[in-house]
């Protein structure tokens, strides 16, 4: 079945089943591998993308639900000019990543949080972070606060 997805400003016509999880369409059909598979049950957050500006766990969203909506992945978060999003820049400045596996989901969740709450509290940040097996939560928190000061 034909499904049309608008990802990072580009339209993709795909011949896939409508119940395919968006995660696999992004990774396997479109080739955007920045969004990671972690758990497959929308619990860990590694697969977080924005759908019409809202953070969503792409492993549990059927492509039929995402069709016709604006989807942004980690690859599309930076500006068209290549300038990093303030959250991405803060991630680098605070030396957040270790293994990096959860990072795209963490960054996407943080960008959505800052859009909704420009000056988040520590409790706000704790409410949106993903599972990080490396335990970089203190650096993640610092990076989100840093990004907030640069008006993400």
Q: How would you label these PLM feature ranges?
A:
Residues 1-152:
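Signature of N-terminal electron-transfer/Fe-S-associated modules in redox systems
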